[in-house]
From Swiss-Prot:
HAMAP family hit by this protein: MenE
Record flagged with keyword Ligase: yes
GO biological process: menaquinone biosynthetic process
Gene field: menE
MF (Gene Ontology): ATP binding; o-succinylbenzoate-CoA ligase activity
Similarity comment: Belongs to the ATP-dependent AMP-binding enzyme family. MenE subfamily.
The protein, known as: 2-succinylbenzoate--CoA ligase
EC number: 6.2.1.26
The protein's role, per its UniProt record: Converts 2-succinylbenzoate (OSB) to 2-succinylbenzoyl-CoA (OSB-CoA).
Record flagged with keyword Calcium: no
Pathway where this protein functions: Quinol/quinone metabolism; 1,4-dihydroxy-2-naphthoate biosynthesis; 1,4-dihydroxy-2-naphthoate from chorismate: step 5/7; Quinol/quinone metabolism; menaquinone biosynthesis
Organism expressing this protein natively: Oceanobacillus iheyensis (strain DSM 14371 / CIP 107618 / JCM 11309 / KCTC 3954 / HTE831)
Stored Pfam families: AMP-binding, AMP-binding_C
């Protein structure tokens, strides 16, 4: 029988009715009681329109109060919230709407109804629906085995797959994070990442489970994030590597307030040089490792280890397990990362064959490559699918990228494999520069730090690198 708890938002509204739940950049805020009432109101409106338990309701929106309320409305209805990426083309969105079996798509006003393959409602249209309390009974309890949300993987390999996330997955993710980072009375978590991304969504849910206010930005902007940390009493922020780079540059010779205690870094390995810069400026960067399939981070450094184990993602969170395929007793040997725990997805929606391939005795094959050191700390090397095999040698793009960004004036770097008749594949690089840099300068630096077979055979200067909505580098789009 599935484990149950009182509905999280109902419970939080009872425990902390007048406490701020969400703050926005325009200065407005919502209490937990207000969030409870508004979410239940949307649930009754959806019920009036005929949506019921088990229905899939797609949401396409930038970060805003309505999006948060409708996600919680789905939980009161017993519906599954399908969270879609606003950067996708209409064709990609329609593919996911059909694949997810969504009954409706709810959007902000900027998306036109005529473009979608199914019924579309914007926030104003849903708001205008009258409530009817007699039609449905809203959920008072949460069943951990029930699917709460679905979000699509970024699709770096083939057609994106919908990851099913249960209430239990989200609960264990939130409580495990609290056991690692701790909870402080003054905590306020900044969300500059999209709520349709697992990092943004998981922090939104932590707010209700912890009773901790969140500060929500519509999108990442350096100045707004900087000001929030400096002036809005933010103590924790979730970031990816490119955000850290830009925030360090914006900070200059200043320092963050003493209450700012954690910059939680996800989205892939970060250059060691960047982490050293952060350490010099006393910026508390905690590397982590996680994915949509693990409902946010599953491996994180502790506050005690953040400055001692630079470059490591840490150890598995309390209820989680991790191993390296075929290398369980061999430290420092690179292999595929496997994870297991109550925050790991049940599987991909309508992908029975894929689920058989990626799950082995409840261990999830992540497709990421890494190794454990002698103390059991994880070091993530790269995506297995980004691996470049050149003349039989394994080349990891992130290693080359890390060396390139050590050159003063190279702000960002991306590396991918390119077909080559002699070697099969060779690395080529794309860089974003803040000053003119000669080929000789780059070549001299690479020669010092990389074996010859790892050095890029081509280097292209570009204005920007392709990134997804979470600002993660999309290597297969380099050069397109």
């Amino acid at each position: 029988m599935s484990e149950t708890t009182p509905h999280w938002l109902t419970k939080r509204a009872d425990l902390s009715p007048d406490k701020k739940a969400i703050e926005f950049e325009d200065g407005s805020s919502i209490t937990y009681l207000e969030l409870f009432h508004r979410s239940q109101s949307y649930a009754r409106k959806l019920g009036k329109l005929g949506f019921r338990q088990g229905d899939h309701i797609a949401i396409l929106s930038t970060n805003c109060a309505e999006m948060i309320q409708i996600i919680y409305a789905c939980s009161y209805l017993g519906a599954v919230a399908v969270l879609l990426n606003t950067k996708l083309t209409i064709n990609e969105l329609n593919q996911q709407l059909l694949d997810s079996d969504a009954k409706v798509i709810i959007t902000s006003e900027s998306f036109k109804a005529s473009e979608f393959v199914l019924q579309r409602m914007d926030y104003n249209e849903l708001e205008s629906v009258t409530e009817d309390t007699s039609i449905i009974t809203l959920k008072s309890e949460i069943y951990f085995d029930d699917i709460f949300t679905m979000m699509y993987t970024s699709g770096t390999t083939g057609f994106p797959k919908a990851v099913q996330q249960t209430f239990g997955n989200h609960w264990w993710s939130a409580t495990s994070s609290a056991l690692n980072l701790g909870l402080h009375d003054n905590d306020k978590w900044l969300i500059p990442l999209p709520l349709f991304h697992v990092s943004g969504l998981s922090t939104m849910l932590k707010s209700v489970i912890y009773g901790m206010p969140i500060y929500v930005l519509e999108k990442f902007e350096v100045e707004k994030v900087h000001n929030a940390i400096m002036d809005r009493k933010v103590t924790i922020v979730s970031v990816v590597t490119v955000m850290v780079q830009r925030l360090i540059k914006r900070l200059g010779n200043h320092h963050y307030p003493n209450d700012f205690r954690c910059m939680l870094l996800g989205g892939g390995p970060a250059p060691k040089s960047l982490l050293e810069q952060a350490k010099l400026k006393n910026i508390p960067v905690f590397q982590s490792y996680g994915m949509t399939e693990t409902s946010s981070q599953i491996v994180t450094l502790t506050p005690e280890d953040a400055l001692k184990k630079i470059g490591s993602a840490g150890k598995p969170l309390f209820p989680a397990q991790l191993k390296i395929a075929h290398n369980e007793n061999n430290p420092n040997q690179i292999g595929e990362i496997l994870v297991k725990g109550p925050m790991v997805t049940k599987g991909y929606y309508k992908r029975a064959e894929t689920n058989k391939e990626v799950f082995e005795n409840n261990w999830l094959h992540t497709g990421d490559m890494g190794y454990l050191d002698e103390q059991g700390y994880l070091y993530v090397v790269d995506r297995r699918n980004d691996l470049i095999i050149s003349g039989g040698e394994n080349i990891y793009p992130s290693e080359i990228e890390n060396v390139l960004v050590q050159i003063e004036g190279i702000e960002e770097a991306g590396v991918k494999g390119s077909p080559n008749e002699e070697w099969g594949m060779v690395p080529i690089a794309f860089i974003v520069c803040s000053r003119p840099i000669s080929e000789n300068e780059i070549a001299a630096h690479l020669e010092k730090y990389l074996a010859k077979y790892k050095r890029p055979k081509e280097i292209h200067v570009v204005n920007e690198l392709p990134r997804n909505a979470a600002n993660k580098l999309v290597r297969h789009n380099l050069g397109k």
